[in-house]
């Protein structure tokens, strides 16, 4: 049986790890073992943060909507409630974009939400 020599494959594997670890500080970009360990952590962080990013953007959209709603004498909570009662289906991403780029359209949505809200805050919504 022929002898298997692994140097070519091993060097290729190590070179790929070190190439992908470029830009890391210190030993993490130069030593194979440290680079490999850092690459595993990097992939874990990337996987976790791709999912966390969605929540971060939702928080940002809500902050922007709330700031714009307060300029129209409403709160975020009342705006969303009013839009639901008025049966206006606009997601938070679009609302935040309108709040930043098209203030007139956002104001129109606020007025529609105000009109749909009951006069008494504690009164149940009309069925």
UniProtKB/Swiss-Prot annotation:
HAMAP family hit by this protein: Ribosomal_bL20
NCBIfam families linked to this entry: rplT_bact (TIGR01032)
InterPro entries in alphabetical order: Ribosomal_bL20, RIBOSOMAL_L20_CS, Ribosomal_protein_bL20_C
GO biological process, one term: ribosomal large subunit assembly
Name this protein carries in UniProt: Large ribosomal subunit protein bL20
GO terms, molecular function: rRNA binding; structural constituent of ribosome
Family: Belongs to the bacterial ribosomal protein bL20 family.
Biological classification of the source: Bacteria, Bacillati, Actinomycetota, Actinomycetes, Mycobacteriales
Keywords of the record: Ribonucleoprotein, Ribosomal protein, RNA-binding, rRNA-binding
SUPFAM superfamilies recorded: Ribosomal protein L20
GO cellular component: ribonucleoprotein complex; ribosome
Tree of life domain: Bacteria
Pfam families to which the protein is assigned, alphabetical: Ribosomal_L20
Function: Binds directly to 23S ribosomal RNA and is necessary for the in vitro assembly process of the 50S ribosomal subunit. It is not involved in the protein synthesizing functions of that subunit.
């Amino acid at each position: 049986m022929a002898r298997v020599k692994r140097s070519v494959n091993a060097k290729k594997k190590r070179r790929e790890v070190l190439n992908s670890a470029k830009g890391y500080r210190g030993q993490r970009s130069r030593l194979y073992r440290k680079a490999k360990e850092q690459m595993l952590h990097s992939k874990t962080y990337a996987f976790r943060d791709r999912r966390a990013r969605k929540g971060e953007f939702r928080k940002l959209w809500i902050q922007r909507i709330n700031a714009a709603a307060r300029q129209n004498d409403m709160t975020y909570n009342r705006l969303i409630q009013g839009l639901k009662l008025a049966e206006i289906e606009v997601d938070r991403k679009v609302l935040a974009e309108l709040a930043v780029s098209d203030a007139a359209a956002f104001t129109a949505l606020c007025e529609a939400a105000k009109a749909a809200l009951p006069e008494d805050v504690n009164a149940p919504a009309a069925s």
